[in-house]
A protein has these predicted regions:
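Bacterial N-terminal signal peptides that target proteins for export
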Residues: 3-21
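Compact, glycine-rich, soluble single-domain proteins
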Residues: 36-163
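Long, non-catalytic terminal segments
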Residues: 5, 32-36
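Bacterial N-terminal signal peptides
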Residues: 17-32
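Short linear sequence elements within intrinsically disordered, low-complexity coil regions
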Residues: 8, 31, 87-89
Length: 163
């Protein structure tokens, strides 16, 4: 029997490429599901009523550092909630952020501490919380004015005292 070594060497390589392609396809298919899992509802209770938002949650250092950078748009009713547990002085900026935002600084009890409205895109100017904040909600600029959101209003989300 004649034994061809080139064929036997190619079989493991072919299997490796098939496995790598399958793993890549699996990761690509699972990516939207992983991103969708980080989106949660958030309520803001104002004098005008309750406004419900769908927010991405930024908890890791990488997520907090990147935030909404490089995004070209943010729909009304969408946003990103940054978890800065435990409550602390927080500073934000707009570096590499193409869209103007309203930044809502939130205390540990869920009350709004301060709102920085209509932030300047791409700016490296520091935007401080001016007090202790456990979270920051970023929404498209004009949202606070549109819905009458003001300091003292309440946020309903599990990050704030489990509510």
């Amino acid at each position: 029997m004649i034994f061809d070594r080139t064929v036997t060497r190619r079989l493991p390589q072919a299997r490796l490429w098939i496995c790598l392609a399958a793993a890549f396809a699996f990761c690509v298919l699972m990516l939207p599901a992983a991103q969708a899992a980080t989106v949660q509802p958030l309520e803001i209770v104002t004098r005008n009523g309750v406004q419900v938002f769908s927010v991405e949650i930024a908890t890791t250092e990488q997520e907090k550092e990147t935030g909404l950078m490089y995004r070209k748009e943010l729909a009304d009713g969408k946003g990103m909630l940054f978890d800065f547990s435990p409550e602390q002085e927080v500073s934000m900026w707009m570096k590499n952020t193409y869209i103007s935002l309203d930044m809502i600084f939130i205390r540990a009890d869920g009350t709004i501490l301060r709102i920085a409205e209509n932030t300047e895109p791409m700016s490296t100017r520091i935007i401080p919380s001016r007090g202790l904040a456990k979270g920051v909600l970023e929404v498209v600029a004009g949202t606070a004015k549109k819905y009458g959101i003001a300091p003292g209003d309440r946020i309903g989300h599990p990050l704030f005292n489990g509510k």
